[in-house]
Amino acid sequence: MSSHIQIFDTTLRDGEQTPGVNFTFDERLRIALQLEKWGVDVIEAGFPASSTGSFKSVQAIAQTLTTTAVCGLARCKKSDIDAVYEATKDAAKPVVHVFIATSPIHLEHKLKMSQEDVLASIKEHVTYAKQLFDVVQFSPEDATRTELPFLVKCVQTAVDAGATVINIPDTVGYSYHDEYAHIFKTLTESATSSNEIIYSAHCHDDLGMAVSNSLAAIEGGARRIEGTVNGIGERAGNAALEEVALALYVRNDHYGAQTALNLEETKKTSDLISRYAGIRVPRNKAIVGQNAFSHESGIHQDGVLKHRETYEIMTPQLVGVSMTELPLGKLSGKHAFSEKLKALGYDIDKEAQIDLFKQFKAIADKKKSVSDRDIHAIIQGSEHEHQALYKLETLQLQYVSSGLQSAVVVVKDKEGHIYQDSSIGTGSIVAIYNAVDRIFQKETELIDYRINSVTEGTDAQAEVHVNLLIEGKTVNGFGIDHDILQASCKAYVEAHAKFAAENVEKVGN
């Protein structure tokens, strides 16, 4: 019988530390709901003491989820722990995650503390946290560069003070398979407690070993894995949870352990994070990449046609990828469209379907067939526009002279107010973005601009991601349209709308 490996998702906390990623309040809530549907055991919803926005989003998630534990991060500071308590007290299963650095380099250069000071702080703050929470998780930051005897002391101190979960972070992705497994074996054999202690692994991917090290931790005695969807996170990212989960599933003969994830929700969860983070999943990404179940070689294709297991160790359907796609066309009606939405796993009310069907027909008039990926894109684009404070109404372009283009942009807010401005620029994109900047009266710096095609062919929809720097803050925007310039404008407007929305939240505080 397989043992249960808990999944601790930190996409909303560590994942959001990815450069250029800044989830909105609504996006955080939608992500949390999808993570619960995916079946993760714990969601680290944020760092409540870091900002009012983080506190409110953690609080909203705690009040919304019904089965998943909601965790908040806290330094060894009572005010941090209090903030987590206030934010998560309405959760079905509230958890506090207390941490302090323990490696020599952190003690000397960051904390300016001795080992004795650190041990005293662990005892004081874990004891305090235990008075407020049934479940207290403790992490010795930079554990893999901490002397092992001192690490054992830190863990024992935390356990004695009431911690029931001990997380061992490979904070800078420094460790390797055997070393990391040895740390867990040492801790499980050395630290003693009358209560059951869950050991957890948290790996970064600086050397490309986050998933491998996470699996090594299980071999060493870990019963919880921390990570993010698609492996997003600071620097090179975190362990990709979908890869850990499928490795355990496929190689259960070796690990003898399984997660409780609803694996069929894996691809949908990955796509959601990719969309909101503005980070496209590489085509060759394990488990969720577009090429994960593609076979280019003639020998491979022949083998798969004869027997799928010749070159596939798991089925696409296992992770929610449909391989029996029936495209729709311009003659498809509302009923066929509604049935397609159901088949793709969407539960959308009839009123919303009316607008989606109009968008579908507009695309169907321009394409020979509308694929499942086109349908997903329509829904994604509609969700983005529905959530935004502002959306693109119309865009007009005109060639002026000497390479200059003129753009007239009309934007509408949720109350129906219209905003219009125009500008010129050296090319269509520059003209469009100058006009949008004038509407929002903000100076911006375009950090990143990416175009991807939703499907193959010259008639494919365009998917545009932008990252802007506005008043020192990075925001991302996303736009989908059959026309590249329309998609580019939608993405830029959405980025401005996100910045405006966050400023409205701050004013309301």
Curated annotation (Swiss-Prot):
Belongs to the alpha-IPM synthase/homocitrate synthase family. LeuA type 1 subfamily. It is found in: Cytoplasm. Residues 5-267 form the Pyruvate carboxyltransferase domain. It catalyses: 3-methyl-2-oxobutanoate + acetyl-CoA + H2O = (2S)-2-isopropylmalate + CoA + H(+). Its cofactor is Mn(2+). Homodimer. InterPro entries: 2-IPM_HCS-like (IPR050073), 2-isopropylmalate_synth_dimer (IPR013709), Aldolase_TIM (IPR013785), LeuA/HCS_post-cat (IPR054691), LeuA_allosteric_dom_sf (IPR036230), LeuA_bact_synth (IPR005671), PYR_CT (IPR000891). SUPFAM superfamilies: 2-isopropylmalate synthase LeuA, allosteric (dimerisation) domain, Aldolase. GO terms for cellular component: cytoplasm. GO terms for molecular function: 2-isopropylmalate synthase activity; acetyl-CoA C-acetyltransferase activity; manganese ion binding. GO terms for biological process: L-leucine biosynthetic process. It comes from Staphylococcus aureus (strain bovine RF122 / ET3-1). PROSITE patterns: PYR_CT. Catalyzes the condensation of the acetyl group of acetyl-CoA with 3-methyl-2-oxobutanoate (2-ketoisovalerate) to form 3-carboxy-3-hydroxy-4-methylpentanoate (2-isopropylmalate). Pathway: Amino-acid biosynthesis; L-leucine biosynthesis; L-leucine from 3-methyl-2-oxobutanoate: step 1/4. Its main location: cytoplasm. Residues 391-509 are annotated as: Regulatory domain. Its EC number is 2.3.3.13. The gene is leuA. This is 2-isopropylmalate synthase. It comes from the Bacteria. The keyword Transferase applies. Mn(2+) binds at residues 14, 202, 204, 238. Keywords: Amino-acid biosynthesis, Branched-chain amino acid biosynthesis, Cytoplasm, Leucine biosynthesis, Manganese, Metal-binding, Transferase.
